[in-house]
C-alpha cells in the first residue's frame, strides 16, 4: 500500500518540498523558523517528522491556516512584529509581507531623520559597529611586487 507523495506543496504562498519533513519544509517559508515550525506542528497535533507531501489535504489546509494566523495561536513574545506601528496589534508576518514591512520601517526612519535613518541613508553601519577599518567601499588598492633583480 504505497501512498502518493506530492513533490510540491503550497503553504503560505510558498512552494515547499513535499519530500521533506513537515518542520523542515515549513522552515523554508520566510518568517517561519525551525522553532516556529515545531510549535505549529505541536499546536495542531501533526507529527513534525512526517513527510509533508504524504499528509492528507485537510492537514495541509490546517498548516496553511496556522502559518497565516500564527498570531492567533502563539503568545505575543513568539511573534516577529509586536505592536505594529500602523495598527498597534501583535502580528506574525511571512513572505513578502515581512520584507515590505522591514523596508517600510527603514523608509520611516529615513523620513523622520532619526539617527538610524541617517545611517541607513548614508549607507553606513547602523548598530554601533566600528567603521575605521571595516565596511569600506570602493576599489581596493592592490599590492604590487618589485621586479626581480636582473642578475640573480
UniProtKB/Swiss-Prot annotation:
Q: Any coiled-coil ranges, and where?
A: none
Keywords attached to this entry? Ribonucleoprotein, Ribosomal protein, RNA-binding, rRNA-binding
Give the gene name: rps13
Subunit organization: Part of the 30S ribosomal subunit. Forms a loose heterodimer with protein S19. Forms two bridges to the 50S subunit in the 70S ribosome.
Recorded protein name is: Small ribosomal subunit protein uS13
UniProt GO MF annotations: rRNA binding; structural constituent of ribosome
Q: Could you tell me which Pfam families the record lists for this protein?
A: Ribosomal_S13
Recorded hits in PANTHER family, A to Z, give: 30S RIBOSOMAL PROTEIN S13/40S RIBOSOMAL PROTEIN S18 (PTHR10871), SMALL RIBOSOMAL SUBUNIT PROTEIN US13 (PTHR10871:SF3)
- GO cellular component terms listed in the entry, alphabetical order: cytosol; small ribosomal subunit
